[in-house]
Design a protein with these regions (language model features):
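N-terminal Rossmann-like NAD(P)+-binding domain of SDR-like oxidoreductases, especially those catalyzing
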Residues: 1-181, 315
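C-terminal substrate-binding subdomain of Rossmann-fold SDR/epimerase-dehydratase oxidoreductases
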Residues: 9, 33, 199-330
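Tryptophan-centric aromatic hotspots in well-structured domains and transmembrane helices
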Residues: 26-29, 99, 165, 186-187, ...
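Residues in well-ordered alpha-helical elements
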Residues: 66, 78, 90, 97, ...
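CheY-like receiver
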Residues: 67-75, 113, 198, 226, ...
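Activation loop
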Residues: 88, 128-131, 135, 191, ...
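The catalytic Tyr-centered alpha-helix of NAD(P)H-dependent dehydrogenases
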Residues: 143, 147-154, 184, 188-192, ...
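Hydrophobic alpha-helix immediately C-terminal to the catalytic Tyr-X-X-X-Lys motif of short-chain
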Residues: 157-165, 195, 253, 257
Length: 330
């Protein structure tokens, strides 16, 4: 469609997979990635820097705000997709202000500036299923919001800001609230790549609470397809859940991953205490995006985990000494 897409948080694994998907499927004029850090090495960048029609810029949304605005005014993207966030609920109980600084304040400041420009067609915010809290049924977009961590609360704050500026100031926005995504190139503190890392290096995965918590998972390419559909077809102002039909316990995720590796489950993990604020179940009703935009989950567990294991085996030597704990960056 010859649009220019700009992806904030474009150096992360989901931003990279979205960029690749748009280049392959959306006929873009250009896809621009923007991140607070330079692109990581090949196991995590997936060669995105070599894609024709892709450019990457290092700009910090909080501390280099003026430089970011200069870039936006230079490129004048038709569509901005925002993945940029402090994104780990488990560590958000300390330095909680850092999560609000990025996830709420910096983004609302950016949108105020965008409202002064006339070139933006659509701003797509990537939210989180965590804002619904723990649920006992698949939740729809209009159900009560019950965040259980400072991280989730910071994401809720910006979602509600977007709703208000769309309603009162006609800011052209959409929100996608996806379930947990996974993909090759994902950093090793996430459960699936960390399980693969443990299986390949002989380390043990700390399985918090025995893995009884249930979450919903989709492959990053399924999320990218939802983003493309929203960018092309969604009415402005709409919010969409994006996830599978059923949740999966963390234990089952680890069991499936161990099986894909060919490593016994008992050899790959050890049971540890549950983390503070751990919700028991995330479960989304995605019928709205399915009926309105024709989205559906295409990549099932077997295909997705096979791809993840292939990625891990291909880069074992590069990732074996890579950090497996979340590091909060500025």
């Amino acid at each position: 469609m010859n649009k220019t897409y700009l992806i904030l948080g474009g150096g992360g694994s989901f931003g990279i997979h979205t960029a690749k998907f748009l280049i392959d499927n959306a006929s873009p004029k250009k896809v621009i990635g923007v991140g607070r850090n330079p692109l990581r090495s090949e196991p995590f960048s997936l060669g995105i820097q070599n894609e024709k029609g892709f450019e990457y810029f290092t700009r910090h949304i909080t501390y280099e705000f003026d430089l970011l605005l200069e870039l936006l005014d230079q490129e004048k993207p038709d569509i901005i997709i925002n993945f940029a966030a402090q994104g780990e609920g488990a560590v958000s109980w300390r330095n909680s202000w850092r999560f609000f600084e990025t996830n709420s304040m910096a983004l609302s400041r950016l949108c105020e500036e965008l409202m002064k420009r006339n070139w933006l067609e659509r701003f797509i915010q990537i939210g989180t299923s965590e804002m619904y809290g723990s649920v006992n049924h698949p939740v729809k977009e209009d159900e009560p919001i019950k965040p259980s961590s400072p991280y989730a609360a910071s994401k809720v704050a910006f979602d509600l800001y977007l709703v208000s500026v769309f309603k009162n100031l006609s800011f052209p926005m959409n929100v996608i609230r996806p379930s947990n995504a996974y993909c090759p190139g994902q950093l090793l503190h996430r459960v699936i790549p960390r399980t693969i890392w443990c299986g390949l290096t002989g380390n043990k995965l700390p399985l918090q609470g025995g893995g009884k918590a249930e979450k919903s998972y989709i492959h990053a390419r399924d999320l990218a397809r939802a983003i493309m559909l929203v960018s092309q077809e969604a009415p402005l102002g709409e919010i969409y859940n994006v996830g599978p039909k059923e949740p999966t316990s963390i234990r089952e995720v680890v069991e499936r991953t161990a099986s894909a590796l060919g490593v016994p489950f008992a050899e790959i993990c050890e049971i540890t205490e549950d983390r503070i604020g751990q919700d028991s179940r995330y479960w989304l009703d995605s019928s709205k995006i399915e009926s309105q935009l024709g989205w559906s989950q295409l990549i099932e567990w077997d295909e997705g985990l096979k791809e993840m294991v292939q990625w891990g085996r291909s880069y074992t030597s590069q990732i074996k000494n890579y950090p497996t704990e979340y590091v909060m960056r500025g």
